[in-house]
Amino acid sequence: MKALRMSRAAGVCAALAIAAASMALATGLRAQDVMPPGGYKGVDPAEHEREKLIDLSRAHVARVKYGGGGDWYGDPSALPNLQREFEKRTGIPAANSEIVIELGDPGLFAHPFLYMTGHGTVKLTRDEIEKLRAHLVAGGFLWADDCYGMDASFRSMVKELFPERELVLIPLEHGIYRSFYTLEGPPKIHEHDGRPPQGWGVMDGERLMIFYTYESDVGDGLEDADVHNDAAGKREQAIRMGVNIFYYALTRE
């Protein structure tokens, strides 16, 4: 199994490089087009100019900056930690820093794996809805992690995004729970109201386009250990779920 995964990892690396080159040629993207507004979070452009250039051959998760008053920036250490663990565990090169993208950015399609989180309202403009829909229909993937409080507005957003599709409960035998680790569904990192953790999604035929972790708080579990003081076992559960989602987003296996 390990040899098979390493073989797949090599294939993913090659596919990422080819896809990056194809994307740049097909869209005419320049480095300044791909760079999200404000650059990499936490990087001083004057001192780290080279860090502005996203290496499209490296796997990464792009955080979506959205309107509506919700804290789209929640769990700030989660994605850098996930990318670091993903590279360490799978052998697939991943970005070092968090990438923030707005849905109206011309470089949106350079980021096949998008991430949303928050405690409050998610509100997209009509233009953002259309661009996100086009991104997902073209093969993109969105992981939304409810940090407790965004459920109603996120479900409303999904209805606006895909009025012809349903947000459905993803069965435990789905590939997203088997892609790298064998899991029994989303973990329960933090308790809020006694409800079980759930994974919801929007399908395009056999392809999962949107994965929504609800009552799970995966992002909290991915944060630096001293943020929530979660037990090591809880953090490991969150990392494994995150790695599985990341791996599935890249391979669809």
Task: Give residue spans per PLM region.
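Extracytoplasmic/secreted envelope proteins and their assembly/folding machinery
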Residues: 76-83, 129, 133, 151, ...
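Solvent-exposed loop/turn segments at secondary-structure junctions
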Residues: 66-70, 119-123, 142, 147-152, ...
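Surface-exposed patches in mature extracellular/periplasmic domains of secreted proteins
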Residues: 92-102, 144-147, 165-173
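Short alpha-beta junction capping motif
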Residues: 61, 113-152
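Aromatic-Pro/Gly-enriched surface loop or interdomain linker
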Residues: 29-113, 119-120, 209, 217-253
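Bacterial N-terminal signal peptides
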Residues: 11-24
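An acidic, glycine-rich "communication" segment
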Residues: 36-41, 151-226, 234-243
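N-terminal secretory signal peptides that target proteins for export/translocation
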Residues: 1-8
